[in-house]
């Protein structure tokens, strides 16, 4: 089994700026993810064009099991991890979840190898 991914599409709430969300992601949110075993990479993409108020947050995990643990932490941590709860509350003030996809890597290769 390959790496596992969580891809979430977030939309800024009216009156919120992308700069605030980007700043929170690069500091507090990233800091919290570093404490969770199995989280390999975080990528935040800003949509352009008609959907420029949307962001795509991709989280890469070592395995499906690491993803399951991350979901458990995400659901339970706000009850006992004050810093995590504060960051999630800020995140949810800035934007709302529009869509979510999860799955494992099927194919990953450089285009020069084709």
Enumerate the predicted regions with their spans.
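Glycine-rich acetyl-CoA-binding "A-motif" of GNAT/NAT acetyltransferases
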Residues: 4, 53-54
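Short, surface-exposed ligand-recognition loops at beta-strand->loop->(often short) alpha-helix junctions
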Residues: 11-25
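Conserved "boundary/linchpin" sites in short secondary-structure elements
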Residues: 109-113
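A short beta-turn/loop motif at secondary-structure boundaries
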Residues: 45-52
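Active-site-flanking beta-strand signature of metal-NTP-handling nucleotidyl enzymes
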Residues: 2-11
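Long, acidic serine/threonine- and proline-rich intrinsically disordered regions
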Residues: 104-108
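An amphipathic, aromatic/His-enriched active-site/gating alpha helix that lines ligand/cofactor pockets
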Residues: 27-41, 60-102, 114
């Amino acid at each position: 089994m390959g790496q596992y991914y969580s891809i979430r599409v977030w939309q800024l709430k009216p009156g919120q700026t992308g700069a605030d969300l980007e700043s929170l992601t690069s500091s507090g949110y990233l800091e919290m993810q570093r404490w969770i075993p199995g989280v390999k990479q975080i990528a935040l993409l800003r949509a352009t064009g008609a959907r420029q108020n949307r962001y795509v947050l991709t989280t890469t995990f070592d395995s499906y099991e690491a993803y399951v643990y991350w979901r458990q932490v995400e659901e339970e941590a706000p009850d006992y991890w004050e810093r995590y709860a504060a960051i999630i509350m800020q995140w949810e003030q800035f934007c709302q979840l529009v869509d979510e996809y999860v799955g494992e890597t099927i194919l990953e290769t450089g285009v020069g190898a084709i």
